[in-house]
């Protein structure tokens, strides 16, 4: 397992968490009194949100605000849970490459950058689905999870993974809840591939977006307005993108000089 896995996993029910807690060696995290949380030393976090769109949106917002980084670093987000399908075999599973909110009719299309994991459609409903009109995984959280998590991360770093627990021949009313951990556990290899792949993607993103130390030095030594901080951030990112990060140190301004003059100097060197 990778040493650094900056991924937030969100499940609706404690039974969905059970296999993940064991697989990822997570321990109870004493954080919110509202949500059951787990974490490990590899930066993984898991939160049990409760069932439904409002509950999952609240859990995502709670974690997202708690983890907001001044450096602009982000984390990956993964929703894991059970779902129903018209005729898919029990225990089959896929990543949602199309997530449709049934009540609004709107759809989202999470970009798929990780190979080796099956993909398919997911439909989020407000009440348990029993007729499964479309060839899709029916569940109650994905659309709200995706909408909220993409406020804190990029689209390709927000994914949903659904395991089929019921279908027309095995209706939702007959689900044996004690089997839910086993349904999730059967996909441990796929989930580990997914989590490790997402970890690599988020680390690549954060490395490319990480601000040069010059930015923090200027902010600590000069009085900058909010707009000037944003301007400085954009300029530093441009220098980094152009491979000119070393040139930043050559620009005067770390001794309490004029902020407007500093911005002009920085802009002139790359215009």
Model-derived features: where do they sit?
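Glycine-rich phosphate- or other oxyanion-binding loops that anchor nucleotides, phosphorylated ligands
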Residues: 31-271
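Polar low-complexity intrinsically disordered regions
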Residues: 1-4, 72-73
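N-terminal beta1-alpha1 ligand-phosphate binding loop
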Residues: 3-28
């Amino acid at each position: 397992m990778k040493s650094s896995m900056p991924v937030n996993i969100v499940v609706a029910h404690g039974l969905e968490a059970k296999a993940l807690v064991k697989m990822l060696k997570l321990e109870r995290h004493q954080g919110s009194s509202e949500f059951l949380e787990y974490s490990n030393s590899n930066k993984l976090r898991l939160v049990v949100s409760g069932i439904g769109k409002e509950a999952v949106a609240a859990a995502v917002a709670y974690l997202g605000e708690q983890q907001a980084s001044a450096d602009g670093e982000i984390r990956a987000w993964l929703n894991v849970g059970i779902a129903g399908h018209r005729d898919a075999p029990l225990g089959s599973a896929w990543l949602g490459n199309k997530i449709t909110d049934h009540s609004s009719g709107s759809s989202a299309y999470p970009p798929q950058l990780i190979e080796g994991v099956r993909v398919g459609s997911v439909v989020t409903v407000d009440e348990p689905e029993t007729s499964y009109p479309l060839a899709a995984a029916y569940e109650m959280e994905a659309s709200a999870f995706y909408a909220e998590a993409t406020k804190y991360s990029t689209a390709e770093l927000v994914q949903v993974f659904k395991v089929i627990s019921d279908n027309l021949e095995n209706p939702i009313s007959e689900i044996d809840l004690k089997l839910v951990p086993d349904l999730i556990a059967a996909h441990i290899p796929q989930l580990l591939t997914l989590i490790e792949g997402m970890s690599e993607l988020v680390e690549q993103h954060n490395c490319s977006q990480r601000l040069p130390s010059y930015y923090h030095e200027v902010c600590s030594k000069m009085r900058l307005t909010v707009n000037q901080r944003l301007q400085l951030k954009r300029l530093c990112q441009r220098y980094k993108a152009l491979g000119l990060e070393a040139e930043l140190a050559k620009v005067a301004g770390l001794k309490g000089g004029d902020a407007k003059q500093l911005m002009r100097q920085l802009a002139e060197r790359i215009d």
